[in-house]
Amino acid sequence: MMKAILIAAATILQAYLLGSVDTGILVSKFVYHDDVRNHGSGAAGMTNMLRTFGKKAAAMTATGDVLKGVLAVCIGRWLFHMLPADAGVSPYLGVYLAAIFAVLGHLYPLYFGFKGGKGVLVAAGAILSIQPVLLPFLAIIFLVCLIPTGMVSLGSVAMAALYPVLTIIYGSLQGYAAGDMLVCAIGSGFMSGMVIYMHRANIQRIREGKEYRFGKHNKK
């Protein structure tokens, strides 16, 4: 029991600390000698980096954010593999603990005054490591929302909202045990909720018709 608690704590800690390494802030400060959080939406994610510093900055940010999600989950999986097979712990607990706290670290980074990004790409990196088969479906959902509207935020919220649904469908098709299904449902639900919560201002602007649209005329 104590070993399981220590492993869970180590998983949470490493994921949060990795998540706190905010690529957007680092790139904006060390490459562009500025802080992206002082511009645009105030977030430190790829979208605001693209709007503020351009495609190269956005690409570097996206790569870093996805990789830290992948790495956090891989470490969490490795740590939980140290538990004996008869420990009665779902193998999905480690990966979802890592995913959730990597996203949390990105949202509230320890090293940067607890003000970071919105977690979409970190979550995508985590999903790439947990259930890569879901990413094409999530990408389609994103594009279906983005292409006609130009709103990245709408695509992000739609992906987040439907991720738990896709997770449950996938788990059912794969014949997950009840305990594993519960962990996956709760874990994906937490990830979804965090991303949607961080987009609450965007959701309000969408309702008011004021949300930023890429490639379209934006009202001032």
Model-based region annotation:
Residues 1-10, 74-96, 128-135, 169-186:
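Helix-coil boundary and interhelical linker segments in multi-pass alpha-helical membrane proteins
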Residues 50-55, 76-80, 101, 119-149, ...:
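Interfacial segments of multi-pass membrane proteins
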Residues 25-58, 204-220:
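Cytosolic, membrane-interface loops and tails of multi-pass inner-membrane proteins
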Residues 7, 11, 15-20, 24, ...:
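Alpha-helical transmembrane segments in multi-pass membrane proteins
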Residues 35-43, 111-124, 151-162:
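Short, non-helical or kinked segments that cap or interrupt transmembrane helices
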Residues 176-178, 183-220:
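C-terminal membrane-associated helical module and adjoining short loops/tails
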Residues 136-138, 152-160, 178-188:
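Loop-to-transmembrane alpha-helix initiation sites
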Residues 24-27, 105-115, 141-150, 200-204:
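C-terminal ends of transmembrane helices
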